[in-house]
From Swiss-Prot:
Protein name: Malate dehydrogenase
Catalytic activity: (S)-malate + NAD(+) = oxaloacetate + NADH + H(+)
Quaternary structure, from the entry: Homodimer.
Keyword NAD: yes
SUPFAM superfamilies listed in its UniProt record: LDH C-terminal domain-like (SSF56327), NAD(P)-binding Rossmann-fold domains (SSF51735)
Length: 312
């Protein structure tokens, strides 16, 4: 199993690469790419960690040497948020980066599963889909927007509030991956109940958690370490499913039946070909239903922005 990380010299990429080097199954290959000249050195640094995961680093304008034979491609390349920016402010720079990298994926490893971490995910996934479609290699079961950070934050914040072990929780989060489009389904956590105020406050905290980190880092970065962990969780789940493990479930932002939007984050059963099943989002509380209805306009606009970037 070969995993390629594109954007591997950045804050998220390095954390992700470290976790993959220590946790990928024995015999896996890990390929690191970034435009930054430091990238081969990051690979050398990680190569000293005693695990049976082969690692190699590539830098420069061309990502294709890193992509040959990749089964999974995780893309975290791009600029990070600064105070006062929201994820959509990143669009102008990151849209072009994602387009260029996906063009190289389309020609080099068109059958790979692709996880997009680069924000704004609501839009960059649509960009990736349109590029792959133009290249004639789009498979909607193999393209994912990585929203796992919303899930791990939900698990953490609910555990803190309710005195639970975070490892025991798995809060489904649906919608998208920015602001109001992030919708944790707090009503679906077995054995945990909330007051209306707790639901409103928790939902808002989960939606704004990225800003909490950006502000706490005082201009020195965004959520890189927790995002690295979230991306590793998703990447490792995908690898397990591709290798035949049954019943692997993760939430991610994928193209589905279009009931709510062309792309929508929901719980997925992963399998040997990527998405095996898009699970139903279940029964929502009145609060959740209203939040879902209210976000769709924003989500549709985010998606349209990505489609137009490629098609106009």
């Amino acid at each position: 199993m070969k995993v390629a990380v594109l954007g591997a010299a950045g804050g998220i990429g390095q954390a992700l690469a470290l976790l993959l080097k220590t946790q990928l199954p024995s015999g896996s290959e890990l390929s690191l790419y970034d435009i930054a000249p430091v990238t081969p050195g990051v690979a050398v640094d990680l190569s000293h960690i005693p695990t049976a995961v082969k690692i190699k680093g590539f830098s420069g304008e061309d990502a294709t040497p890193a992509l040959h034979g990749a089964d999974v491609v995780l893309i975290s390349a791009g600029v990070a948020r600064k105070p006062g920016m929201d994820r959509s402010d990143l669009f102008n720079v990151n849209a072009g980066i994602v387009r260029n990298l996906i063009q190289q994926v389309a020609t080099t490893c068109p059958k790979a599963c692709i996880g997009i971490i680069t924000n704004p995910v609501n839009t960059t996934v649509a960009i990736a889909a349109e590029v792959l479609k133009k290249a004639g290699v789009y498979d909607k079961n193999k393209l994912f927007g990585v929203t796992s950070l919303d899930i791990i934050r939900s698990n953490t914040f609910v555990a803190e509030l309710k005195g639970k072990q975070p490892e025991e929780l798995n809060v489904p989060v649906i919608g998208g991956h920015s602001g109001v489009t992030i919708l944790p389904l707090l009503s679906q956590i077995p054995g945990v109940s909330f007051t209306d105020q707790e639901v409103a406050d928790l939902t808002k905290r989960i939606q704004n958690a990225g800003t909490e980190v950006v502000e706490a880092k005082a201009g020195g970065g965004s959520a890189t370490l927790s995002m690295g962990q979230a991306a590793a969780r998703f990447g490792l789940s995908l690898v397990r499913a591709l290798q035949g493990e049954k019943g692997v479930v993760e939430c991610a932002y994928v193209e589905g039946d279009g009931k709510y939007a062309r792309f929508f984050a929901q719980p997925l059963v992963l399998g040997k070909n990527g998405v095996e099943e898009r699970k139903d989002i279940g029964t929502l509380s009145a609060f959740e239903q209203k939040a879902l209805d209210d976000m769709l306009d924003v989500l549709h606009k985010d998606i349209e922005l990505g489609e137009k970037f490629i098609n106009n």
